[in-house]
UniProtKB/Swiss-Prot annotation:
GO terms for biological process: aerobic respiration; electron transport coupled proton transport. Keywords: 4Fe-4S, Cell inner membrane, Cell membrane, Iron, Iron-sulfur, Membrane, Metal-binding, NAD, Quinone, Translocase, Transport, Ubiquinone. The keyword Iron-sulfur applies. PANTHER family: NADH DEHYDROGENASE, NADH DEHYDROGENASE [UBIQUINONE] IRON-SULFUR PROTEIN 7, MITOCHONDRIAL. It comes from Sulfurihydrogenibium sp. (strain YO3AOP1). It holds the Pfam family Oxidored_q6. This is NADH-quinone oxidoreductase subunit B. [4Fe-4S] cluster binds at residues 34-35, 99, 128. One of its GO terms (molecular function) is quinone binding. The lineage of its organism: Bacteria, Pseudomonadati, Aquificota, Aquificia, Aquificales. Binds 1 [4Fe-4S] cluster. PROSITE patterns: COMPLEX1_20K (PS01150). It comes from the Bacteria. NDH-1 is composed of 14 different subunits. Subunits NuoB, C, D, E, F, and G constitute the peripheral sector of the complex.
């Protein structure tokens, strides 16, 4: 964005959409273990995610960010995939904690070894459990990623055939 000397802001539609998307994230949380408690603490008054435009939603159909917090077991994986598919585009995923990111400290047969095996993940937040500051860091990293991504489609040149001069029909 650029501002002229007369106070007029010059920008593109793509930049306005990017600004709106990154400054009004509506996450839906899938709290599966102790990381969910830290996620709730992040939304409380001390950290206040509302000031960043982050409003937690109860339905995936109203959300654009999925925060997976905690251990994902194989039995829950299809439901998590369904929640992801119900979200409208564009959508982003944050994997919160070591259990969601890599399966946790004890790799066992019912535990999914990373949520990225079933849905694409945009930001990984380390920790067991991650602190509220770490979740805020992850959200800010996601905002940087949204700002850097270009949403518009590339223009392609389509060759145009110019009709040749028509010749009069002779009788």
């Amino acid at each position: 964005m650029a501002m002229t000397s007369s106070g007029i802001i010059l920008t593109t539609v793509e930049e306005v959409l990017s600004w709106g998307r990154r400054n009004s994230l509506w996450p839906v949380s899938v709290g599966l273990a102790c990381c969910a408690i830290e996620m709730m603490h992040t939304a409380a008054s001390r950290f206040d995610t509302d000031r960043l435009g982050i409003i937690f939603r109860g339905s995936p159909r109203q959300s654009d960010v999925l925060i997976v917090a905690g251990t994902v077991v194989n039995k829950v994986a299809p439901m998590l995939r369904l929640i992801y598919e119900q979200m409208p585009d564009p959508k982003w995923v944050i994997s919160m904690g070591g259990c969601a990111s890599a399966g946790g400290p004890f790799p066992t047969y019912p535990t999914l070894q990373g949520v990225d095996r079933i849905i694409p993940v945009d930001v990984y937040i380390p920790g067991c459990p991650p602190t509220p500051q770490a979740l805020l860091w992850g959200i800010l990293e996601l905002q940087k990623k949204i700002k850097a991504k270009k949403e518009g489609k590339e223009l392609i040149e389509i060759p145009i055939k110019v009709p040749q001069e028509s010749k009069p029909i002779s009788k």
